Design a protein with these regions (language model features):
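C-terminal regulatory/oligomerization modules of transcriptional regulators
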Residues: 1-4, 125-141
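N-terminal leader segment of winged-helix/HTH proteins
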Residues: 1-32
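Alpha-helical linker/hinge and terminal dimerization helices associated
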Residues: 15-22, 26, 60, 103, ...
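N-terminal helix-turn-helix DNA-binding core of bacterial DNA-binding proteins
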Residues: 24-63
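Short, locally clustered residues in the helix-turn-helix/winged-helix DNA-binding domain
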Residues: 43-47, 108, 135
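Residues within helix-turn-helix
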Residues: 53-54, 65, 72, 92
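Charged, amphipathic alpha-helical coiled-coil/dimerization segments
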Residues: 72-128
Length: 141
């Protein structure tokens, strides 16, 4: 087990180093001003339009109060907006603003550079094996 933990630790440090290198190479100041949870919410809203706070908290497996606080922060910063459901006026949908869409593009660019720099050194078989391991991890949750 020690070898596995050592390898995993080395991978974690490699990931952190790649992250730093890419941040130093580009202007990711908008992205860096947000916490991981905020970015995750923006990515989720890109994938699923018209989510409510409850649906978002279910997707992210996070308490609704935590998500509502993050939503308020993102609304205040202009990344998302609330839109009232025409059929049920008590329900509010969450939508990305133009600023939110732009930040998601910045995140996609960063993530692509990051993943390419990390995975490019692995051969195809290793990439497939890692994908299989990650897929199994999802099944365990």
């Amino acid at each position: 087990m020690a070898d596995f933990r050592t390898e995993l630790s080395e991978l974690m440090h490699e990931i952190m180093n790649q992250n730093k290198k890419i941040i130093q190479c580009g202007d990711y100041s908008n992205l860096l001003s947000l916490c991981e949870q905020d970015i995750t919410i923006l990515v989720m809203l890109k994938k699923h339009e018209n989510l409510t706070a409850k649906e978002l908290s279910d997707h992210l497996r996070a308490p609704k109060t935590t998500i509502v606080t993050a939503i308020s922060r993102l609304v205040k910063r202009g990344y998302i907006r609330r839109v009232q459901n025409a059929k049920d006026r008590r329900e509010m949908y969450l939508l990305l603003t133009e600023k939110g869409v732009k930040l998601n593009k910045e995140h996609d660019e960063f993530e692509t550079l990051f993943l390419n720099s990390l995975v490019s050194r692995w051969n195809i078989e290793d990439q497939k094996e890692m994908a299989d391991l990650l897929a199994r991890r999802k099944e365990i949750r």
